[in-house]
Regions:
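Long, aromatic- and glycine/proline-rich binding clefts that accommodate carbohydrate-like moieties
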Residues: 272, 320-369, 376
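Extracytoplasmic/periplasmic solute-binding protein
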Residues: 130-134, 139, 159-207, 249
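Glycine-centered hinge/linker elements that transmit conformational signals in sensory
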Residues: 162, 204-234
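Hinge/lid segment of periplasmic solute-binding proteins
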Residues: 90-138, 150-162, 186, 270-272, ...
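Extracytoplasmic/periplasmic substrate-recognition and gating elements
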Residues: 51-56, 129, 220, 224, ...
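Short helix-initiation/N-cap motifs at beta->coil->alpha
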Residues: 65-73, 91, 157, 232-246
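Conserved N-terminal structural module of periplasmic/extracytoplasmic solute-binding proteins
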Residues: 14, 27-95, 109-112, 256, ...
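A structural signal for short loop-to-beta-strand junctions that line the ligand-binding cleft
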Residues: 83-84, 112-145, 171-172, 281-283, ...
Length: 398
């Protein structure tokens, strides 16, 4: 990365501000940066961006990827500790903004213009911007081209394909079905929703749609696929990834972060839209991965300089992308460079079919309530209707 990216005046101002913050309870020492990101993202590439920043500016940058990063961030930031920068999808942002764990940002015009406006909107909450968008994420159907010539358009086609492949000792599909993020597309296909909207168009947490007739159709499909042996009981992400890598399963539902391992395994794979449910398109959550500045940080201006003038530049994004694919970059110029890649195109297609994850604090109740519901559905402890009704009641505090 070019050292010219650092502007001496801005950097001097950053250090002045960092010293000013030193008296307050902070995450790290002034003039140093600690960055947290999830373990399935390109943390080694992000560290390279940090190393380039250190070389250019003399500011040490450490990148970590703790387990249960959101939980640890909440605890640490509430205690005046933790990272200076936290990179995470936008859906938890409203909760952290409301709790005072992150600070609003005011990006310059060029920074804002370089990034898709829809990505910025994901980080808007109560009239302010709370994070810098890095990439737009949407899961899709990843298929092994050696086993699937044409990806199925519907789940009816998936079930037919499973019969054909079962005769050869293979299975058609597997995904981390107890994880709401991966199963939501089939619940949303028929009209399932997390929250309704109020008269102003804002999310209304008193209007819950996880037990709507459309969501129930998707849940019944999931229960049936396990009951009828199309997918095994008790499978998770590791089982899915292992079976796909061994060629035992022809398709999986996952995101761009999975591509790198598939390339290393020399699997010729493609990405397609998630199959339809009962004639309705599956609608994945669209997440915008972004970087937020923690309220306790003593180095807020240094953090801003690092994000705006290093990480979000095409050179910085390329470092992260080379480690683990970003999927669809929010940066317009970098997306243009990658747009010829059919897997990037398919990811954008899935994003266009999907819906942004709500970013209000009540999303925490959604994730916990739906996790229990899916476990109960797939283990046969509750019928799909009982499980979804219970999830809706928990979300409403009943």
């Amino acid at each position: 990365m070019s050292t010219q990216a650092i502007r001496p005046i801005a950097l001097a101002a950053a250090f002045t501000a960092a010293i000013a913050f030193a008296g307050a309870a902070g995450a790290q020492e002034a003039g140093k940066l600690l960055v947290w990101i999830n373990g399935d993202k390109g943390y080694n590439g992000l560290q390279k961006v940090g190393d380039a920043f250190t070389k250019a500016a003399g500011v040490p940058v450490t990148v970590e990827h703790p387990e249960d990063a959101p939980g640890k961030f909440q605890q640490a930031a509430a205690a005046g500790k933790g990272p200076d920068i936290f990179c995470w999808p936008h859906d938890r942002m409203g909760e952290w903004a409301k709790s005072g764990l992150i600070v609003p940002i005011n990006p310059g015009k060029k920074v804002r213009d370089d990034i898709e406006e829809t990505a910025w909107k994901a980080f808007n909450y109560q009239g302010k911007t709370w994070g810098y968008p890095v990439s737009v994420e949407a899961i899709g159907l990843i298929y092994n081209k050696a086993l699937v010539k044409t990806p199925p358009k519907s789940f009816d086609d998936v079930i037919k394909l499973d019969k054909e492949l079962s005769a050869k000792g293979k299975k058609a599909i597997l995904w981390d079905y107890n994880n709401t993020y991966f199963t939501w597309p089939i619940l949303a296909a028929g009209g399932g929703s997390v929250f309704g909207r109020d008269a102003k168009g804002e999310y209304d947490p008193t209007k819950v749609g996880v037990n709507s007739p459309g969501a129930l159709k998707g849940a019944e499909l999931l229960a049936g696929m396990i009951k009828n042996g199309q997918m095994p009981k008790g499978s998770g992400y590791a089982e899915m990834e292992g079976a796909f890598n061994k060629g035992e399963v022809a398709m999986m539902i996952s995101g761009p972060w999975a591509w790198d391992n598939l390339k290393k395994s020399n699997i010729d794979f493609g990405v397609a839209p998630i199959p339809d449910v009962a004639g309705q398109p599956s609608r994945p959550f669209v997440g915008v991965l972004g970087c937020m500045i923690a309220a306790p940080s003593k180095s807020k201006d240094v953090a801003k300089e690092f994000i705006e003038n290093h990480l979000l530049k095409v050179e910085g994004l390329k470092m992260v992308n080379a480690d683990v694919p970003l999927g669809t970059p929010a940066n317009k110029a970098f997306f243009k460079e990658l747009a010829e890649n059919p897997n990037i195109k398919a990811t954008m297609e899935n994003a266009k079919r999907g819906e942004p994850m709500p970013n209000i604090p009540e999303m925490g109740k959604f994730w916990s309530s739906m996790a229990s519901a899916l476990e109960n559905i797939t283990n046969g402890r509750q019928s799909p209707k009982e499980a979804l009704d219970a999830a809706a009641a928990r979300m409403l505090g009943k």
